[in-house]
Swiss-Prot record:
It catalyses: tRNA(Lys) + L-lysine + ATP = L-lysyl-tRNA(Lys) + AMP + diphosphate. Coiled coil: none annotated. This is Lysine--tRNA ligase. It comes from Rickettsia peacockii (strain Rustic). HAMAP family: Lys_tRNA_synth_class1. Keywords: Aminoacyl-tRNA synthetase, ATP-binding, Cytoplasm, Ligase, Nucleotide-binding, Protein biosynthesis.
């Protein structure tokens, strides 16, 4: 075994941990189908949200980690449940009243409310595929509608009929009495209306491959379970799909956790082997509620990319997948700055094992670009924007160029993008909420001390020396907690409760400019 393999197999980075589980489940053997299958799922009832991107990004991290541990071929499929009947109408789509007329219809049988594709489901699928393509994911797209209608699941659907009693014995204890009386794993597609029916099944015939139900008029209707004439309820469908496609690895949100045992048992009943599974925690909105495609209560991918590079979004997805995280606009600056820190550490680190533990290794699948920001962070640029209120990024570059003469927009495109992002973020989220603290007499003494200190130092003074001088002024002012001291300075000078290390900020903003800012508050 190579040293690289040894470092990878010992790594505690979660993608490698998951990859080792897959390798162990295979006993090192190539599956009969010739590859290891990774599956992600998508419910196209509403527009894809950032959680959909997150699941695919995480899945690829595990896939690439597995490829580092093994030379067994891999395949990633994105499976769209587009044959599901419409249960609720999303609030963030055009013409919701029109869509409401098609309740219980398969998503691929509803007209496209956006007027671009052959159906509502096709439109949602296209949106998913376009942004997966945009970010370079290599995947095969599977449509539930196509799989059912093309007969890909026919063999398994006949087996569900053959194992009908066993599956019902598994499922019924999970329901209330009222639901037990009507439940069946099969949902016929009504020959007249095309709706997905949740009706009691009066008769099932494995030999004929049919189920029989009563329509509203009391007539017995017999339909084949194959060829797209029936769909399985979502829990049996999950397990059936694992067995039919021979899925080796699947991850899903915590909302699936209670049913994971059922998925696995149904897969076994149908002769399959359940995949290795990872349950990730859900993203929460600003109110602590689960984000939802139908509600549209989350940041979209386009929203995030308006204010930050894609790598910061990938870092958010990488970090602690089994921990619930609040996903709103205020998490963006922190993730940008953490990405910069991890990137710099990666390129300073010579120990391969430590590189494997660095999130950027998994974000970039081992091919990590080197970025240079000269110590300038996104947060620092936001604060610089706050004091100079620039109309465009050229104003920020005026300060950046004085701080680091070797930096230019052409030679440092990452920093150039950050400057543009910072102005957008400031205008949309900070500017309207600035609230300045009027300095008290005590504050004015402090400000005068800072002004005197700035007048005495040379322009070449290092940031740490300036920071220490400001720190000493706070100590002399008699604050019990210096956090309160810095908070007061941020409120007086920047109009916000938090701010940068002032030594670094003053070096970027300039000593003379900072003197003018302080004088303005005196």
């Amino acid at each position: 075994m190579s040293e690289i393999w040894e470092d990878a197999i010992k790594s505690n980075a979660w993608p490698f941990v998951e990859a080792k589980k897959i390798l162990d489940s295979l006993n090192g053997q190539i599956p009969e189908k010739g590859y290891v299958l990774f599956e992600t799922g998508y419910g196209p009832s509403g527009l894809p949200h950032i959680g959909t991107f997150g699941e695919n990004a995480r899945m690829v991290m595990v896939q690439k980690a597995f490829e580092q541990l093994s030379d067994i071929p891999t395949k990633l499929i994105c499976f769209s449940d587009d044959m599901d009947g419409l249960r609720t109408v999303p609030s963030n789509i055009p013409n919701p009243e029109m869509v409401a007329q098609y309740m219980d219809m398969p998503l691929t049988s509803i007209p496209d409310t956006f007027g671009e594709c052959e159906s509502y489901g096709h439109y949602m699928n296209a949106k998913l595929r376009s942004f997966l393509d945009k970010f370079g994911f290599e995947y095969a797209f599977y449509s539930s509608t196509n799989c059912y209608k093309a007969g890909m699941f026919d063999e398994m659907l006949i087996m569900v009929l053959e194992k009908y009693d066993e599956i019902m014995e598994l499922m019924l204890p999970t329901f209330r009495e009222e639901r037990k009386a009507t439940y069946s794993p099969f949902m016929p597609i009504c020959p007249k209306t095309g709706k997905v029916l949740q009706v009691p099944i009066e008769k099932w015939d494995a030999k004929a491959g049919t189920v029989t139900y009563k329509d509203k008029a009391g007539n017995y209707i017999e339909v084949p379970v194959t060829g797209g004439h029936c769909k399985l309820q979502w829990k049996p469908d999950f397990g059936m799909r694992w067995a039919a496609l021979k899925v080796d690895y699947e991850m899903y949100g915590k909302d699936h956790l209670a049913n994971a045992r059922l998925y696995s048992e149904i897969c076994r009943i149908l002769g399959g082997k359940p995949p290795v599974q990872l349950c990730y925690e859900l993203f929460l909105d600003e109110n602590g509620e689960k984000i939802s495609k139908s509600k549209g209560n989350s940041i979209s991918i386009d929203d995030w990319l308006k204010y930050a590079p894609v790598e910061s979004m990938a870092l958010f997805m990488y970090q602690n997948p089994t921990r619930a995280k609040r996903l709103f606009f205020d998490v963006i600056p922190k993730n940008v700055d953490e990405y910069i820190t991890f990137n710099q550490k990666y390129h300073l680190e010579e120990d391969r094992a430590k590189r494997f533990a660095n999130p950027v290794y998994h974000i970039h699948h081992g091919n990590v670009p080197k970025i240079e920001t000269f110590g300038i962070t996104y947060s620092l640029l936001l604060n610089l924007t706050s004091v100079c209120n620039p109309s465009d990024k050229s104003v920020l570059w005026g300060f950046i160029s004085k701080y680091e003469p070797n930096a230019t927009p052409n030679t440092n495109p990452y920093l150039d993008h950050l400057a543009e992002f910072a102005i957008r973020y400031y205008n949309d989220f900070i500017k309207a909420h600035k609230s300045y603290l009027s300095p008290s007499e005590k504050h004015k003494v402090i400000l005068q001390d800072i002004l005197d200190m700035l007048s005495d130092i040379a322009d070449q003074t290092e940031a740490e020396a300036i920071q220490k001088a400001i720190y000493d002024i706070g100590m002399k002012a008699g604050y019990e907690n210096l956090r309160d001291y810095f908070k007061d300075l941020y409120q007086i000078l920047l109009g916000q409760n938090e701010g940068p290390r002032l030594g670094t900020f003053i070096k970027l903003y300039g000593v003379q400019e900072m003197k003018k800012l302080v004088e303005g508050q005196l």
